[in-house]
């Protein structure tokens, strides 16, 4: 994917990351946490232009959970309230057991997509997301068994190397779909040069998604549009609409990037178009 894909006006897939597993309503009252709230947020995001919703689960007290039953409740609400949006479960999580990381894959029906973190990360002072090759392989194996498309989350250059390692070890259905992630800490430093290097280093034929954390969300998704890629926005990654002003909803962030894509001449993909692009 490249600037030529932008010039060709290829459709852009917008993913809405609705909730996340870190901050809660103490950070913003607009963050959806209950299954009903997440279902409503998914429907609103789809109406605004999202074809994929990235889903984390929370307990009633707002804490993160990997329980299959909770993901099932959320999926049921999304399917009840939304139209045709693609559900993508998160399997990422600092401090979670390997077994817990598999639980989001076991809903009935399975999600059409799920995230797959490509390597270790330092996230907090005393906790690390290990994401060993053994865990990555076992998650990928279960995704294949259940017909789930993996979304490879590439947080840094080392994870790009791990992506090639996964391709050497296992068969991945075309197209490979990777999310390039920019921000603080272990993430790729949010510099335009690093973005260009990342897309140049992608496996041949791969489709890429662009994610910038916090204030980097808007400039990086705009670059993603201009370089023929796909984009992710949402309250998981950024709770502000502009400096000092909280976003009122996930849909508000989706509406803005959909408008930018339209003004730059790229059609916003429908869920059916996204399924065709990603070979779901």
What are these regions (language model features)?
Residues 16, 63-89, 138-145, 197-205, ...:
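Alpha-helix-loop-beta-strand connector modules within alpha/beta enzyme cores
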Residues 35, 65-131:
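Active-site beta->alpha loop and helix N-cap motifs at the rims of alpha/beta catalytic domains
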Residues 113-236, 247, 252:
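Catalytic alpha/beta core domains of metabolic enzymes, predominantly
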Residues 16, 35, 39-40, 50-64, ...:
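Histidine-centered catalytic micro-motifs
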Residues 26, 51-73, 181-182, 238-243:
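Glycine-rich, proline-tolerant flexible connector loops at the mouths of alpha/beta enzymes
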Residues 16-39, 90-99, 125-129, 153, ...:
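Active-site mouth loops of central-metabolism enzymes
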Residues 38, 45, 56, 114, ...:
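Conserved, mostly hydrophobic/aromatic
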Residues 4-30, 115-122:
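N-terminal small/glycine-rich loop or linker at the start of catalytic domains
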